[in-house]
């Protein structure tokens, strides 16, 4: 868990998520950067939209953390997802899981199995 008074924030929550994963030696990309067949595990982080909180002057920003493993490494998908989730615990309370997680999906374009985990961040409306 981060200490808000000591944490060195980036310019955006997306950058904080990216940096946290990168610092844990997890290969991480922005959407559209990684191309070609998946030959080892990696993560893609994307901003997944936002909505206004119904009772407060707050926006709820969503982030998709997409975990990929090669097609022949399906058995490593769950351990990799858990590893990513454990690493991102360091960013609590800035981001929290929404409880939404996709079933595993085989993406023929990248020859990879993928699971997406959704995280949220509450941000005061300016």
Label for each model-derived stretch:
Residues 1-29, 47-126:
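Charged, amphipathic alpha-helical segments and their flanking helix caps
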Residues 29-36:
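Short acidic low-complexity segments
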Residues 38-39, 59:
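A short, polar/charged loop/turn motif at coil->beta-strand junctions and beta-hairpin connectors
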Residues 39-48:
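A short, hydrophobic beta-strand-centered structural micro-motif
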């Amino acid at each position: 868990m981060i200490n808000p008074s000591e944490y060195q924030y980036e310019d955006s929550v997306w950058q904080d998520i990216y940096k946290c994963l990168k610092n844990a030696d997890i290969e991480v990309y922005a959407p559209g950067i990684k191309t070609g067949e998946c030959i080892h595990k990696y993560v893609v982080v994307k901003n997944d939209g936002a909505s206004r909180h119904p009772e407060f002057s707050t926006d709820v920003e969503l982030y998709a953390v997409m975990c990929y493993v090669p097609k022949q490494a399906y058995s490593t998908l769950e351990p990799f997802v858990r590893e990513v989730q454990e690493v991102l615990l360091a960013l609590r309370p800035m981001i929290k899981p929404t409880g939404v997680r996709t079933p595993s999906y085989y993406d023929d374009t990248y020859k990879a199995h993928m699971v997406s985990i959704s995280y949220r961040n509450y941000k005061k409306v300016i």
